[in-house]
Design a protein with these regions (language model features):
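Glycine-rich FAD pyrophosphate-binding loop
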Residues: 22-48
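Anionic group-transfer/hydrolysis microenvironments
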Residues: 6, 34, 114
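N-terminal FAD cofactor-binding segment of flavoenzymes
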Residues: 44-86
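Short glycine-rich hinge loops at helix-strand junctions in the catalytic core
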Residues: 25, 64, 128
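N-terminal Rossmann-like FAD-binding beta1-loop-alpha1 element of flavoenzymes
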Residues: 3-30
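Conserved N-terminal helical subregion
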Residues: 72-137
Length: 137
């Protein structure tokens, strides 16, 4: 089979790219050498989170996956910046910013990486224009 676009890498960014191209009508093959770990308690699960700021949330809405994510998203209402530069690796200055000072919306939303992989994999399965082949390199 021929594809318009091949995405090499089925992590969060690769699956997001595949979903975006697929939503635009391109035929897409997304490959990754390993299947995504989609269960929080599975060995090797990525327990970190990713923050999506407002423009990224709009992009996720545009490509059709935000409805799958919104119920799991934690608002990023306060952003704390810490200065730990210099010779000693210690925090010297911190500053907190509250999103309500500039907007009715939070700065963004945090989502667990393992959950993003699960939801993106399920979303790709529902796109007729995208073939997701984990376990392929």
């Amino acid at each position: 089979m021929e594809y318009d676009i091949i995405v090499s890498g089925g992590g969060i960014a690769g699956m997001a790219a595949a979903a975006a191209f697929g939503a635009d009508g391109y035929s897409v093959l997304c490959v990754d050498p390993a299947p995504p770990i989609t269960d929080r308690d599975a060995e090797g699960a990525d327990l970190r989170s990713t923050a999506f700021l407002q423009p990224a949330q709009a992009f996720l809405e545009e490509i059709g996956i935000w409805p799958r994510l919104v119920q799991h998203a934690m608002p990023l209402q306060v952003m704390r910046i810490a200065d730990a530069g210099g010779q000693e690796p210690e925090i010297r200055v911190t500053k907190a910013f509250d999103a309500s000072d500039i907007s009715d919306l939070p700065f963004g939303w945090n989502l667990p990486n393992w959950l993003l992989r699960r939801e993106f994999a399920a979303h790709l399965e529902g796109l007729k224009t995208v073939t997701f082949k984990p376990g392929t390199s």
